[in-house]
Amino acid sequence: MIPIQNVYYMLSYAFQVLNEQGYKNIATEQFHNTAELMAAILEKGIAIQLKRGLGKEYIPQTEALSSLRGKIDIAESIKTQSTLRKQLICTYDEFSVNSIMNRIIKSTVEILLRSNISKQRKKNLRKLMLYFSEVDFIDLYTVNWNVQYNRNNQTYRMLISICYLVVKGLLQTQSDGSTKLMDFLDEQRMCRLYEKFILE
């Protein structure tokens, strides 16, 4: 079994951001399982991201409006007979924090809150999730993990990668379709995940 402290050092090697000043105190903490380690890294990373501001992106919206906004969907307006109610079906883009990356983070933290981590860590993560109130949950099985990063969302790279490790390492599907949380990542699984990180 790979010691949990070594897992942190492997992650530090893969993500140079963990060597920054804000993450130094994580290196000295003692962790009972990898879920606790991942939760600590996410807690610190989310707090830093919140100081920078949550990433936003344009989300397409379609709704019946009494005033024009964006493009008019004429076919849908006729089909729903919204003109009788003096409304039009409009399609527009809304600049929102409900981005894919924020949804992945919120859903992953929800998994960690149900896992075997300390009460204080759970409390801290719940406090951070208050800032994600406008963010929806996402089914983590359907997520495309090949996220495109640019200058604006580069700070999310490490957070999304940690979320990937949590989802692939802590979720185990049972025969009835429900999921249960594993207490730790077995050695083979951890080696495979780390190899994927090195290759990416």
Regions found by a protein language model. Give the residues of each.
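Terminal, charged accessory segments of proteins
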Residues: 1-180
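Acidic-basic catalytic patches of nuclease active cores, encompassing PD-(D/E)XK
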Residues: 183-199
